[in-house]
């Protein structure tokens, strides 16, 4: 009997990118363009193809923690930069909130 496939967590629902991945990608693009850096140059600096950088910036592919750390170093920002200015609508779509597991701040 085949085992059920475990969700990768990449898509929020119905094939749409996770809103947090889209936000992180938009912050990567913002910082890259503020530095006047091309996708090709950023990709080369972190050992990827420019197509992969495009996918990160669109939120189509999730950025892993070690890759996010590398991006932060190359783009000269703290890792937290990628999560700044996140709209409440995006924050409300986190899995723990969707499942009712998050506790409101005290």
Question: Where does each model-flagged region fall?
Answer:
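N-terminal flexible/basic segments that precede or flank functional cores
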Residues: 1-20
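Interfacial/linker helices and their anchor residues that mediate assembly or domain coupling
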Residues: 90-106
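Alpha-helical residues within the helix-turn-helix
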Residues: 33, 44, 73
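Conserved hydrophobic/aromatic packing and binding residues within compact polymer-binding modules
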Residues: 28, 42-43, 53-56, 82
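Short basic helix-loop element that most often maps to the first helix and adjoining turn
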Residues: 26-41
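Short C-terminal boundary/hinge segments that cap the last helix of small helical domains
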Residues: 76-93
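Short, basic-rich loop-to-helix N-cap that marks the start of a DNA-contacting helix
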Residues: 60-70
